[in-house]
């Protein structure tokens, strides 16, 4: 009987390398594919994609599997990066990694894998898929510190129908141990951090190449001018570092609480529990449920509003215009427009939506939040 073919997205990192190994052990016909999504040279003039592809080649040779490289730079620019820049222009804080999964890793890459006669595709994500009773469910990875369902939350059951997540049942330590036992060349390679196309580089320096900075005033909520900002796009709600206005007022740290786009003003408040940092709900659009529109119009669940945040109890109200009003059981700090609200039922990731508007807490409920 012909072996089932799996095309594995290999990044040069340890997770996807171990994923490829596990699939080969299970008897699949495994092909490794490296996706080049960004024409990338770091601050030292080194093309990190070239280094990563070298690691893919070395690991593939160690595992005895064929490998290819595919260039998705144009798709990435058109479908992910332009959105990222547009959102920043709107004063929002986008999450390009979620869109990269939806548009590149589970769309463009799937199309490419099918051209290689793949039965399945696989990645090194820490997530699990449950296929029972004709339904596909996306479940959190076994390692709570590494669970990546947040980034996969805009996928659909159709996306996931041909996907395998071989390391979803493992912890990061277990994955590293397997790589070390196999003497894989990248067994001790550190995890990549930051937005994929920025990597370890300075965010401000990177953005200057694409968006002209427009410095403006930093003001308190009372209207007092406290300093100048470098451009609203460089700041996010809840940010404390890099404001350059310490030592004023009560002496407590200052936090970004809002952006006034019209007047190019960054609004700040003092104290980590200032009421202006908290919200009681949000309005979201681009709602995507893994299994389509099967939820009731109003339902209770938990949610995350940023990666690795503790789950928050919420009630979701789907509105006739297709947006959602998400009501928080308790006020939540630093919820940010442009970010992704991801909904869960215990371990099951239900789907997600893009945060459009945050409903700020009024001062009377401040004590409950602090």
From Swiss-Prot:
Domain of life: Bacteria
Molecular function in Gene Ontology: ATP binding; tRNA binding; tRNA-uridine 2-sulfurtransferase activity
Catalytic residue list: 100 (nucleophile), 196 (cysteine persulfide intermediate)
EC number: 2.8.1.13
Stretches the record annotates as Interaction with target base in tRNA: 95-97
Organism encoding this protein: Geobacillus kaustophilus (strain HTA426)
Keywords: ATP-binding, Cytoplasm, Disulfide bond, Nucleotide-binding, RNA-binding, Transferase, tRNA processing, tRNA-binding
Protein name (database record): tRNA-specific 2-thiouridylase MnmA 1
Pfam families (UniProt xref): tRNA_Me_trans, tRNA_Me_trans_C, tRNA_Me_trans_M
The family this protein is said to belong to: Belongs to the MnmA/TRMU family.
Residues under site feature: Interaction with tRNA: 125, 339
Region ranges (Interaction with tRNA): 146-148, 306-307
Cell compartment(s), UniProt: Cytoplasm
Residues where ATP binds: 9-16, 35, 124
One Gene Ontology term, aspect cellular component: cytoplasm
CDD domains: MnmA_TRMU-like (cd01998)
GO aspect biological process, one term: tRNA wobble position uridine thiolation
Reaction catalysed by this enzyme: S-sulfanyl-L-cysteinyl-[protein] + uridine(34) in tRNA + AH2 + ATP = 2-thiouridine(34) in tRNA + L-cysteinyl-[protein] + A + AMP + diphosphate + H(+)
Job description of the protein: Catalyzes the 2-thiolation of uridine at the wobble position (U34) of tRNA, leading to the formation of s(2)U34.
Disulfide bonds: 100-196
UniProt-listed InterPro entries: MnmA-like, MnmA-like_C, MnmA-like_central, MnmA-like_central_sf, Rossmann-like_a/b/a_fold
Root EC class: transferase
